[in-house]
């Protein structure tokens, strides 16, 4: 717990159904109880939300990742924003540890939507005043909004884990980006651990299928740490791990901020060359989706600090790195 000074303040934190354990941990660290609200479903599937305490004039923070089931969690968020607006909240801040539809951030082919922008429009129209996000798949999504966005990074949390792991010697490690787009993220982790980086050149013939083509960098005899923002079906990460092993890597660790882990991901990871998978709790993982070799790190402390700084009208930029 960070402090007790916010117990009787106008700071309110609410959780929807997306990741209640994370929201509870954030509230505990801030030093307040979660706000009281009910989220129910009608028999036809419609969502009904009721805020069970006064929030008039309050600074409200709604914690909700729009993870699987994406559409249900997104609708819960939009309805809650509307409920807060109609209940006269002074400020409606949404805390989105995982932003669904972020991978649809551009037109890859003709006649395709830009759904990440559509979601931004929906959030703004519903009435949100600010968003605190964690590792957006495409940083330019911040530009889809006309409200302030605080974009936090999970890399420092992952870096701290490896720094404190007695089985890891940074001098014998190499940080690996699974594609060209992740080089900036890999460089940040490499800077923390003071290690070199490598890049995997891959081509994706069709969605959810990845082919590892070439590795750029020195791998032989080193412990390889693959870092990505999202692991979905785990095709990319497991093929990358095998390619690194084939190139002489001593051990292969994989890490990501957002463990989507859909479809065959669990089986693929458990049967792969990956020694350990390090993820954050930005997405709620049940045992049916969590590989046995998974280590989960908490982002609650980071989110709690961001919430307090926003509430106190202090700079959040110190949390960006």
UniProtKB/Swiss-Prot annotation:
Q: Name one GO cellular component term.
A: cytoplasm
* UniProt main location, coarse: cytoplasm
Q: Which UniProt keywords apply?
A: ATP-binding, Cytoplasm, Kinase, Magnesium, Metal-binding, Nucleotide biosynthesis, Nucleotide-binding, Transferase
Pathway involvement of the protein, from the record: Metabolic intermediate biosynthesis; 5-phospho-alpha-D-ribose 1-diphosphate biosynthesis; 5-phospho-alpha-D-ribose 1-diphosphate from D-ribose 5-phosphate (route I): step 1/1
Q: What is its EC number?
A: 2.7.6.1
**What positions does the entry give for ATP binding?**
44-46, 103-104
Q: Where are the transmembrane segments?
A: none
Q: What GO terms are given for molecular function?
A: ATP binding; kinase activity; magnesium ion binding; ribose phosphate diphosphokinase activity
List cofactor names only.
Answer: Mg(2+)
GO BP field: 5-phosphoribose 1-diphosphate biosynthetic process; purine nucleotide biosynthetic process; ribonucleoside monophosphate biosynthetic process
Reactions catalysed: D-ribose 5-phosphate + ATP = 5-phospho-alpha-D-ribose 1-diphosphate + AMP + H(+)
Claim: Ubl conjugation is one of the keywords in the record? no
Similarity section: Belongs to the ribose-phosphate pyrophosphokinase family. Class I subfamily.
Function according to Swiss-Prot or TrEMBL? Involved in the biosynthesis of the central metabolite phospho-alpha-D-ribosyl-1-pyrophosphate (PRPP) via the transfer of pyrophosphoryl group from ATP to 1-hydroxyl of ribose-5-phosphate (Rib-5-P).
Quaternary structure, per UniProt, is: Homohexamer.
> Can you name this protein?
Ribose-phosphate pyrophosphokinase
């Amino acid at each position: 717990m960070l402090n007790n000074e916010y117990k009787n303040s106008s700071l309110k934190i609410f959780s929807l159904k997306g990741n209640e354990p994370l929201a509870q941990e954030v509230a505990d660290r801030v030093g307040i109880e979660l706000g009281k609200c009910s989220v129910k479903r009608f028999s036809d599937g419609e969502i009904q939300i009721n805020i069970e305490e006064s929030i008039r004039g309050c600074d409200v923070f709604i914690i909700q990742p729009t993870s699987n089931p994406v559409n249900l969690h997104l609708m819960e968020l939009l309805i809650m924003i509307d409920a807060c607006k109609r209940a006269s909240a002074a400020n409606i801040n949404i805390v989105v540890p995982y932003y669904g539809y972020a991978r649809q951030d551009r037109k890859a082919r003709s006649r395709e939507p830009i759904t990440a922008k559509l979601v931004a429009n929906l959030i703004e129209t519903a009435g949100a005043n600010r968003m605190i996000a964690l590792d957006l798949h495409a940083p330019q999504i911040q530009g889809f909004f006309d409200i302030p966005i605080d974009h936090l990074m999970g890399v420092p949390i992952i870096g701290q884990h490896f720094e404190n792991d007695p089985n890891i010697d940074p001098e014998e490690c190499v940080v690996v980006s699974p594609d060209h787009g992740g080089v900036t993220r890999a460089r940040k982790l490499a800077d923390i651990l003071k290690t070199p980086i490598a890049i995997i050149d891959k081509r994706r013939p069709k969605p959810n299928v990845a082919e590892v083509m070439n590795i750029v960098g020195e791998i032989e005899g080193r412990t390889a740490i693959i870092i990505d923002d999202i692991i979905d079906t785990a095709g990319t990460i497991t093929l990358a791990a095998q390619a690194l092993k084939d190139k002489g890597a001593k051990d292969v660790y994989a890490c990501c901020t957002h463990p989507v882990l859909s479809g065959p991901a669990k089986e693929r990871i458990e049967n792969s060359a990956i020694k350990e998978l390090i993820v954050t709790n930005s997405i709620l993982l049940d045992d049916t989706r969590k590989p046995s070799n998974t280590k989960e790190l908490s982002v609650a402390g980071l989110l709690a600090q961001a919430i307090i700084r926003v509430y106190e009208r202090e700079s959040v930029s110190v949390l960006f790195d």
